Amino acid sequence: MTTLIASSLILSACDSQTPDTSASSEVLGTENRLEAENNGVPSDTEKDTNRFPASLTPIPDSYLTEAEQQGTLQDFYYDTYESFSYNEKSQRLQKHAVVYLPYGYDESKQYPVFYLMHGGWSNEYTYLGSPDEPHGMKHILDHGIANGEIQPMIVVCPTYNNTSPEDSGDYSLALRLTDNYHNELINDLIPAVEGKYSTYAEDTTPEAIAASRDYRAFCGFSMGSMATWRTFEHSLDYFRYFMPSSGGPAASTETYESVIKDSGHEWDDFFIFAASGTNDFAYSGFKNGIDAMRESDSGLFCFADNEAEGNLYYLESDGDHSGEYAMLYFYNGLCWIWR
């Protein structure tokens, strides 16, 4: 069995003291809150009861096979603009995402939305697959939702690829595209997705998207993690939850602290769940970045296994830089969020 190691540091809400390290082994407005409770999403007062585990929970083997109760995958097309000339809007592009709808999707209910970005040398099909050829992450969602481990949600797999499907294979280009991606994400993708499907956004204006940020998450592994950090940097007003793994951070702790201060958000307005593997080539830089946030005395990053007491948590495996471990990190984040 693969050994999974957790770096678990628990602090009370924004305690200024440096936490001890322990390791263990094992592979809203009122209306929105009421709607959330009716759909099984916890209210603010319930969040403290939902804690991350002390170590990463392995994905059951059966979750990699087809479930009896299956959600659906849909091809989703939307219009946007070429990344580097985005502000000029001189080159229109039609782009594609894969959208997962949970089993029993009901337009009379509202669903939180989980945006999942691929890494390098990849595309929007990498994790969920396609409607005709679903991949393992789709099966994991189906089983987790059916067994009550994962909250029913909409999952969107877009791409930062720009004018070519090969863009993600160029490392320096991919870095630039993930830094620019927030333009397309906020102005084009979210309004298109959340204007079509039943979410917590009352409409697709920037104000409504910001008002529904508690029910929106961004996640990614490797270059998708870089996109996640950039989303935190550029789009904190529109997302509450961020799940980077094995990539970045894309900027310094001081930069992120300035982002938080400038946004007007407090320490309890967001949550970051981060993960990596000790045999991952990105491990050292990634963990150093998390440690810098954890050790900051600004009071803006608070390490805890739940969002009532903090806004930052980190778990690690002994894994390498591979899709197997990416799905492990995603699964653990999905089992916690909105529960």
Where are these regions (language model features)?
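Bacterial N-terminal signal peptides
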Residues: 2-8
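C-terminal motif of bacterial Sec signal peptides marking the signal peptidase cleavage site
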Residues: 10-13
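Bacterial signal peptide processing site
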Residues: 15-17
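Non-catalytic cap/lid and distal C-terminal segments of serine-dependent acyl enzymes
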Residues: 20-339
